[in-house]
Every structure is written in C-alpha cells, then in structure tokens.
Design a protein with these regions (language model features):
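A contiguous loop/helix-start segment that scaffolds small-molecule binding in enzyme catalytic cores
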Residues: 5, 15-20, 32, 38, ...
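Short glycine-cluster motifs
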Residues: 12-82
Length: 158
C-alpha cells in the first residue's frame, strides 16, 4: 500500500472510533510517521504516539554490535540508504570524515554505491562493516567484513 493510501485509510477508519496503527520500530526515523500525523492533523483527528525501539540500533544490538563504544565510536549517525533516484542528498564527503558509527537504513540494494562513495571521499577501505537484514526478527541475518567488500556482503542477504 502506498503512503497516500495508508493516510487515507487512517483518516477513514478513525471516523468509526479508535484506530491503532502499528509500525515496526520508531515511526519517525525513516518510518513516514510524520506524513501520517500531518494527514490526521489536517482532518482534526486526535492521535497518540507510542514510539518503538528503532532498528537503527536494535538490529546491531541483536548481533552483539554496539553502535557506540567508549574509545571507539562516541557517536552514531543514521542515514537513509534508499534515496529517490535523481534526488540524492547524502553528503558522502562529510560522512567519510566522521569517526562515529554510520548506520544506513534500507541500504541493501545501494551497498555498492554507499561503499564506493565513502571510499572515494576518503573513508578507509578497511573500515569494519556489518550488514544486517530482517533485524530483530527470527529471520535476522548478520555478516561482517570491511568497507571494501560491503557490496558482496549485501548480496549474501538477497
């Protein structure tokens, strides 16, 4: 279902009483929850948000990988790995300079581009990486390697 249909469904069903909209993870971290809130506000519909735990760190935790670690990574940065074609805005030059953990969400199909752009902008080819698919579910897969073989690791997930 496309987002516009989801928004319309929320508005239509709310006219009949309480509606619960369940989303995996945090609805405001690349979850399009903001768009749903706007649709509700525009239709004068009251709502309540109960945020979930975001996959931007929970998937790594399930693999035993901390996104921050004293002396290693004192910050983490969440980036979409799934930009609209022709509307790319990720600043790989700035990302390559960061010393914290880079978390790309929904980036399996873009892994080769992500790897190439980071390396082209100065990130070490030996930077450790993990590729996680279906995080925090019974189907979760996690493989690790380096930035050089990120694309090959991602292909193991498909």
């Amino acid at each position: 279902m496309v987002q516009e249909e989801i928004n319309k469904t929320l508005v239509e069903h709310s006219r009949f009483g309480n509606v619960v909209r369940l989303k995996g993870g945090d609805p405001f971290i690349f979850g399009r929850g903001g768009e749903e809130i706007i649709a509700l506000i525009e239709n004068n519909i009251d709502y309540e948000i109960v945020p979930g735990i975001s996959s931007c760190y929970s998937a790594a935790e399930y693999c035993g990988i901390p996104v921050t670690h004293r002396g290693v990574a004192t910050s983490f940065h969440v980036i979409t790995g799934h930009e609209k074609v022709g509307n790319e805005t990720v600043n790989y030059s700035a990302l390559a300079k960061l010393s914290g953990t880079l978390v790309f969400l929904m980036g399996l199909s873009s892994a080769e581009n992500i790897s190439n752009k980071l390396i082209e902008n100065g990130k070490s080819e030996n930077t450790p990486v993990a590729v996680i698919s279906s995080g925090t579910t019974p189907r979760q897969k996690c493989v690790t390697g380096t930035l050089t073989n990120l694309s090959a690791l991602a292909k193991q997930m498909t």
